[in-house]
Amino acid sequence: MEQSISQIRSDVFKGKSQNYTAEAYSEEKEFPFINDCHVGDKKTCVVIKIKDCSTLNLNAKIVYSGVSYETALTYNNVSNSLTATVIVSSLPKNSLTLTVISQDGEESITLTSVKRSDTISPIKALKSVQNKEKDYINSLYDNNVFKCEIYIRLLAEGDYNFYYVGFANGEGKITAYLLDASDGKIIAGKND
C-alpha cells in the first residue's frame, strides 16, 4: 500500500510580517499530479502559501541550508491565497526564510516549523488508518492490486498537529480521515 502514496507532507512552517501571513510545507509528491490511481514521478518540494494578500503579482524566494530558490506565485481560488510549488534538492529542517518580492520592494519572513516533538511519522499515521479501518482498506483492493492513490498531509492549527489521510479512487471520489498527530487516533472521517 505504501507504493500508492502520491503525497507526503511531513512538516509545516508558519510566519508573518507586517504585510504577509505565510506558510510553507515540506512535501514528497507526485508532480505534476494526476488523480488516476497510479503514482507517477515524485519530487521533493516546498509548497509556499501566502494568505490574505491584496496583491496578485508577487514572486517569492526561499532560503535554507545555504541554498536559494526563487519562483512566481499564482492565485489559488480554492484557498484564496497565492501559492507556488518549488522543486528542491532537500527539505528544510526547522525554519526557512521567505522573501516576498513585489513591485514595491522585498519583505523577509522567517517561517518556523510548527511540527510538535510528539508528532508521529506520516507512515505511522497511514498504518493507524490501516489498522482501524481494515474493512474499508480491504475494499480498496481488486485482485490484490490497490486501487487508490494516498495523500498524507501534516496539518497544524494553533498548538495542535493533525494528519489528513486521503484515499483517491481516480474517479473524483476521496475518502479522508483526520487524525490526532500525537497518537494516530482517528478524529473524523469523510466519504465523498
Residue ranges and their predicted role:
Residues 105-116, 177, 189-190:
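Edge beta-strands of extracellular beta-sandwich domains
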Residues 69-85:
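Aromatic sugar-binding surface patches on proteins
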Residues 2-54:
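Extracellular ectodomain segments of secreted/surface proteins
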Residues 51-53, 103, 166-172:
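Short, flexible beta-strand-to-coil junctions
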Residues 66-74, 106-108, 187:
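Surface-exposed loop/edge segments in extracytoplasmic proteins
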Residues 9, 19-21, 47-48, 52-68, ...:
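Short, non-transmembrane alpha-helical segments in secretory-pathway proteins
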Residues 60, 91-105:
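Short, aromatic- and glycine-rich surface loops/edge beta-strands on solvent-exposed regions
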Residues 84-88, 142-182, 190:
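Exposed beta-strand-loop-beta-strand "reactive/processing" segments of non-cytosolic proteins
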